[in-house]
UniProtKB/Swiss-Prot annotation:
Belongs to the eIF-2-alpha family. GO terms for molecular function: mRNA binding; translation initiation factor activity. SMART domains: S1. The modification Phosphoserine is found at S56. Residues 21-92 form the S1 motif domain. Heterotrimer composed of an alpha, a beta and a gamma chain. It comes from Arabidopsis thaliana (Mouse-ear cress). This is Eukaryotic translation initiation factor 2 subunit alpha homolog. The keyword Transport does not apply. Residues 312-344 are annotated as: Disordered.
Amino acid sequence: MASQTPNLECRMYEAKYPEVDMAVMIQVKNIADMGAYVSLLEYNNIEGMILFSELSRRRIRSVSSLIKVGRIEPVMVLRVDKEKGYIDLSKRRVSEEDIQTCEERYNKSKLVHSIMRHVAETLSIDLEDLYVNIGWPLYRRHGHAFEAFKILVTDPDSVLGPLTREIKEVGPDGQEVTKVVPAVTEEVKDALVKNIRRRMTPQPMKIRADIELKCFQFDGVVHIKEAMKNAEAAGNEDCPVKIKLVAPPLYVLTTQTLDKEQGIEILNKAIAACTETIETHKGKLVVKEGARAVSERDEKMLTEHMAKLRLDNEEMSGDEDSGDEEEDTGMGEVDLDAGAGIIE
């Protein structure tokens, strides 16, 4: 299978052409007099055409508002002439359900293709050979190779073990014989497993909620500390809850989990526990932003905001020490480095 200059171009699926009435992902390449020429991204960029009459169900006032060069989107297959290689497509006949199904399939296929191509390039193997021996058999066995790759993360032998291929050899008697051998060599298996685990091992997502927490009663700091501890106690081993001060009276509750819905549920329980505790001491909790998944950018912005507030507080500390003593708000200070700890 190995070669010095491997061919890294190959369609994603075993079928060379798509089926009629199937939604496929395309990229617009050129707009001509009669319609738009496009590349079918899942089929090694073979060419298709969308006639202007198939762009919209409504009267077309401006072609440029309906289709643009470079745009990637799902369309419906109308006709396929396999002998001539003609593929007619329609944008106006693709439904919202078709679009969603196509996008989900394409995103999975694109990830599989990226992994397969990287392995082929690394080992100097023709990409089509890798698909013939591994990729397409996994599509047949599992419905989609993506589903097989998910299993392969933890149990590669159960996925790759059953795959075989035929090779022809010349026997001792000079006759050509066909032998059935494993489809995957150890070298290919190691590279494939390494790439799949790197790209597909689930990463925990961060769930966050923003609250305001106040208690102006005597020993308000103690009551806030108790409420925070009860909030953290609502977490579990899979979803540990942490609560930190941003700036009085704003706090953030966070957890990390592989299950988004479970993480949101746990944070809501933590907020409920915190609310119950602080209200028994005539305090108040207001949810500013409910539990939701946050991105790395959101977390970076929060960290920068907290660092700025800490710096501002340090600059003001000299003035506070030299001036008149201010009224205690019962909020206390939270030791940011110690997580939920409070300095009294």
